[in-house]
UniProtKB/Swiss-Prot annotation:
Name of the molecule in the record: Beta-lactamase HcpA
Lineage start: Bacteria, Pseudomonadati, Campylobacterota, Epsilonproteobacteria, Campylobacterales
Disulphide bridges: 56-64, 92-100, 128-136, 164-172, 196-204, 232-240
GO biological process: response to antibiotic
Subcellular location: Secreted
Source organism (scientific name): Helicobacter pylori (strain J99 / ATCC 700824)
E.C. number: 3.5.2.6
Primary role: Slowly hydrolyzes 6-aminopenicillinic acid and 7-aminocephalosporanic acid (ACA) derivatives. May be involved in the synthesis of the cell wall peptidoglycan.
Family the UniProt entry places it in: Belongs to the hcp beta-lactamase family.
Stored InterPro entries: HcpB-like (IPR040239), Sel1-like (IPR006597), TPR-like_helical_dom_sf (IPR011990), TPR_rpt (IPR019734)
Keyword list, A-Z: Antibiotic resistance, Disulfide bond, Hydrolase, Repeat, Secreted, Signal, TPR repeat
Length: 250
């Protein structure tokens, strides 16, 4: 009799599990991207690809971008720049700023497509409009040097500033450099300080130089040395050289 009860209970539990499995929702597009990232961390590129493909089909731009990166780098698939462009394009069309920037890189470098700096600048522009910080920095550089777009220093600075506000340290450094050239040292210090806070050793080194030379601030050798040390620890050769010149060990 007891055996029958156990069998009955086991049967009910199995049915319950089946019911629960049936009620569980399929992962949505963003969840699929997260699952794909977890698979990448485990080096399971086949499973990651499956998750990203599904996410891309569900119009999650970031999933398309990951697929593009797989094809560009040959991770879990054969290297195929044409497919990379296809998926980056879809990601960009779905308003993923990262995808627009990576697509811009391929056009700028002529990888899988004819080299086209003008078209690259258009993709960088969309990337920046979508608040992708690195897209703003690269677009700023194109305006700074007049590559693929007319030279416009004011626009370049505005783009560097936007990138810096979005916490891209190269944007902060480039803005600081432009302020330094214009002898607006106080503004340069603000940008270099932010780059240093973002743990970019180049920003720390530049800030140290200004503190040591009393540019836009009172001379502060002690703080300058601290910033040279931060720069040197980040493998900035100039910062290490400055410490050697001052006969200070790291």
């Amino acid at each position: 009799m007891l055996g029958s009860v156990k069998k009955t209970l086991f049967g009910v539990l199995c049915l319950g599990a089946l019911c629960l499995r049936g009620l569980m929702a399929e992962p949505d597009a963003k969840e699929l991207v997260s699952l794909g990232i977890e698979s990448v961390k485990k080096q399971d590129f086949a499973q990651a690809k499956a998750h990203f493909e599904k996410a891309c089909e569900l119009k999650e731009g970031f999933g398309c971008v990951f697929l593009g990166a797989f094809y560009e780098e040959g991770k879990g698939v054969g290297k195929d720049l044409k497919k990379a462009i296809q998926f980056y394009t879809k990601g960009c069309e779905l308003n993923d700023g990262y995808g627009c920037r990576l697509l811009g890189n391929l056009y700028y470098n002529g990888q899988g497509v004819s080299k086209d700096a003008k078209k690259a600048s258009q993709y960088y522009s969309k990337s920046c409009e979508l608040n992708h910080a690195e897209g703003c920095t690269v677009l700023g550089s194109l305006h700074h040097y007049g590559v693929g777009t007319p030279k416009d220093l004011r626009k370049a600075l505005d783009l560097y500033e936007k990138a810096c506000d979005l916490k891209d340290s190269p944007g902060c450094i480039n803005a600081g450099y432009m302020y330094g050239v214009a002898k607006n040292f106080k503004e340069a210090i603000v940008r270099y300080s932010k780059a240093c806070e973002l743990k970019d050793g180049r920003g720390c080194y530049n800030l140290g130089v200004m503190q040591y030379n009393a540019q836009g601030t009172a001379k502060d050798e002690k703080q300058a040395v601290e910033n040279f040390k931060k720069g040197c620890k980040s493998s900035v050769k100039e910062a290490c050289d400055a410490l050697k010149e001052l006969k200070i060990e790291l």
